[in-house]
Amino acid sequence: MSQSIKIKNALISVYYKDGLEPLVRLLAQQGVQLFSTGGTEQFIKDLNIPVTAVEDLTGYPSILGGRVKTLHPKVFGGILNRRALGSDQEQIAQYEIPEIDLVIVDLYPFEETVKAGGSESDIIEKIDIGGISLIRAAAKNFNDVVILASKDDYSTLQQQLEAQNGETTLAQRKAFAKKAFHTSSHYDTAIFNYFNAEEPLNVFKHSINQAQTLRYGENPHQQGVFYGDLEAMFTKLNGKELSYNNLVDVDAAVALIDEFEEPTFAILKHTNACGVASKPSILEAWNVALACDPVSAFGGVLIANREIDLATATEINKLFFEVLIAPSYQPEAVELFRAKKNRVILQRNEVELSKKQFKTLLNGVIEQDKDLIIEGPEQMTAVTEKAPTSQELKDLYFANKIVKHTKSNTIVFVKNDQLLSSGVGQTSRVDALKQAIVKADAFNFDLKGSVMASDAFFPFPDCVEIAAEAGITAVLQPGGSIKDADSINMANEKGIAMVTTGVRHFKH
């Protein structure tokens, strides 16, 4: 088996030419014969570097509007022939096929064309045939051939050739092949998912190019990696790298804050809101949100849907927190936060988020649509003798937005666009209710005149009875229990309003 191989012949055919010139010049200096196609051939000629057209090698012109350029035995024979196999070498000599030691190729911008909203005919024309075939052939024969399928590898190969007198090692070629198969598999997955958008086949195929190694996973003894493009979603203005737990909380925070249009601040801990308020100014929203549970807010993730000015930053700066997220910041606010180097300050970018959720379990993956609907006053049906007031309806809507994003079983209390307290992640609904009452009392909230939202129906009337005795005047629940009538009758007996939405919002 061969080890070090000196590059004598190279085939170069790329869609994007940026970054290519230094490597091409080095290959020419080292006496490598270059073969190329179309625009790449002209690019090399413009550098005053000798290059042979692939058409001259094959004896065939580019045909079918450029669909067929490199698909020819004289090209693929030169790539796939095994240098150590006598029969291959005999055939190469018989048909006068030059051995190609290096293939530099990229792929048509299929994903970019889809994202740009191109027509189906434009998208189809960006399905690369020759390029993907060259990648697979060269990567398959890594024992004898170098494959570069990404401009990110140009400088790496250049350094190797300069240091090794124009040669590459087997280990280096195998590493390039691994990257090339990643490129080809990602490309094919993107094409499949485009075709699978309508009447999808029941298969799971996803590919993400970007990855970020995390400090650790959920706990220090666990390893963690984030697959995705964080830089597209956020601009980090300050702080250390995000941890696994930070990312989980940031995801929950973004999902929650996007429910609100008015100036709103939310504080989260372990994905659950411990403070939410909507007020005329973001400063007031911060102060009111913090008052919900200033104890749990310590070390939390904070998110706002308005610019953070210096006055608001000054108040936030009094609290120890892990992450702050906002659409923008006044420069003076950023400078204030940078006084503590580890605090993460993120500025949100305009990015469309996925509408799907995935979770690994057992030996597989489950997928579902994200819970993206929310029921407002128009979708609330009064089922009691007493109808909710306009303010109660407004607060019920506010509470419904929060309960949707809180771990089940959950109960949420709200008054005047402020979260008063919540019971979170309990194994029974009545326990969630009791927890919420205890928390409200701990922070001196009077529940009289407040409203309650439940993420699922009441199996028994006890929750309604306890809530009414605590001062709740209106209740929201999805309904759907075979004992709905018992809870409705209890609400009527206690003289409070109840609405149903018909939509459950479990969150696990």
Task: Enumerate the language-model features and the residues they cover.
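Glycine-rich nucleotide/cofactor/substrate-binding loop typically near the N-terminus or early
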Residues: 39-109
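Active-site/ligand-binding-proximal alpha/beta "capping" segment
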Residues: 83-132, 136-138, 381, 387-390
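Glycine- and Gly-Pro-enriched alpha-helical subdomains that act as flexible
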Residues: 274-294, 418-464
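Cysteine/selenocysteine-centered motifs that mediate thiol-based redox chemistry or coordinate metal-sulfur cofactors
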Residues: 302-303, 309-318, 443-484
